[in-house]
Amino acid sequence: MKFEHLFAPMQVGKVTYRNRIVSAPMAFGLIVQNPAARDFTYRKLEASAKGGNGCVIVGETDVNFTDAVRIPGFRPFDFAKPEEDPETFDAVGEYARRIKRHGAVALAELVHCGKEKVPFGPGQEAIGPIETTNLAGVKVRAMNEDDMARVAHDFAVSATYMQK
């Protein structure tokens, strides 16, 4: 099998990828809120860029802290107001700085776990396209139009945050 274009640059919109090698999403995006995990996590993702990948993707980053969170323990913040938590903003931004330093494109995997949600605290619930019970035995509420609009907005706001 030949991959004639694997190492050729590729233009996607305004972004040029130096090649077509893309790393799968790695690490939880907000794990860098934990100072003890930062250096290892940065080095893990930076190594892919340094090694020649054209694109490195920061892993699972929840778009809100109510019904999107799959793994507990991250400090909630408002994606619309990065100035309110400059430590997290700078820590997340360091991913992009380290990846781009080696000529790779930096992306983030923005997620909403939907019906797979296991509520960890008050005010959290699982929501999905239909009412059901998930594999963990949690009752999932069917999303209404307000939920859909809110979640779409959360994706847009968190995407803007990641682009800053």
What are these regions (language model features)?
Residues 1-164:
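Flavin-dependent oxidoreductase catalytic cores
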